[in-house]
Amino acid sequence: MSEALTELASYLGEARGNLIAASQLKYGELTLTATGENLIALLTFLRDDAKCGFVNMIDICGVDWPQRELRFDVVYHLLSPKKNLRIRVKVATDEDTPVPSACAVYPGADWFERETWDMYGVLFTGHPDLRRILTDYGFEGHPLRKDFPTTGFVEVRYDDAAKRVVYEPVELKQEFRNFDFMSPWEGTEYVLPGDEKAKQ
């Protein structure tokens, strides 16, 4: 598999090296890094080229790196059924710089981009309907950002007396505690097949 990916990386470097900022083959997976300006051209080439054939977009996800200037990575996971290969295409962006929508190249990118915007706040230009898909309509913030509080801002619950859903500020019943999960109990010493070899 990695031999085929090595050949693919070499071919992509020769055929469309101007669209690829970096290429990395690690842990048996090929990752291409592109800029926002070259993203759509690269995705179109990967889909249409006979030696590539990445006709399926499996997923789009976000990664938050708060310490970086370009805080977010938008990662496109592609599949070539004919070649039985998977690759990733990465684009770095910040909170204010939108990424071009891949919906024209891969119509299935629609909901994936909505999810990435909903969870991380990454904007996509040219998206036909960029609105929340997983969180509630009035939700504030983007919950998969590393600076989003784990408790959230608002508690949503159904009020049986009012017969409706109510939104209230989060009220913690106790302070945060630091739990020590190390057990004071000593476990049984199990003798597993092959242990005698480890002692030699």
From Swiss-Prot:
Membrane topology: Peripheral membrane protein
GO molecular function: NADH dehydrogenase (ubiquinone) activity; NADH:ubiquinone reductase (non-electrogenic) activity; quinone binding
First-listed, main subcellular location of the protein, grouped into a coarse class: membrane
Compartment annotation: Cell inner membrane
InterPro entries: NADH_DH_suC, NADH_quin_OxRdtase_su_C/D-like, NADH_UbQ_OxRdtase_30kDa_su, NADH_UbQ_OxRdtase_CS
Name of the top EC class for this enzyme: translocase
Annotated keywords: Cell inner membrane, Cell membrane, Membrane, NAD, Quinone, Translocase, Transport, Ubiquinone
Keyword Nuclease set for record: no
Catalytic activity: a quinone + NADH + 5 H(+)(in) = a quinol + NAD(+) + 4 H(+)(out)
Keyword Transport in record: yes
GO cellular component: plasma membrane
E.C. code: 7.1.1.-
Family note: Belongs to the complex I 30 kDa subunit family.
Complexes and interactors: NDH-1 is composed of 14 different subunits. Subunits NuoB, C, D, E, F, and G constitute the peripheral sector of the complex.
Function in brief: NDH-1 shuttles electrons from NADH, via FMN and iron-sulfur (Fe-S) centers, to quinones in the respiratory chain. The immediate electron acceptor for the enzyme in this species is believed to be ubiquinone. Couples the redox reaction to proton translocation (for every two electrons transferred, four hydrogen ions are translocated across the cytoplasmic membrane), and thus conserves the redox energy in a proton gradient.
Protein name: NADH-quinone oxidoreductase subunit C
Provenance organism: Rhizobium etli (strain ATCC 51251 / DSM 11541 / JCM 21823 / NBRC 15573 / CFN 42)
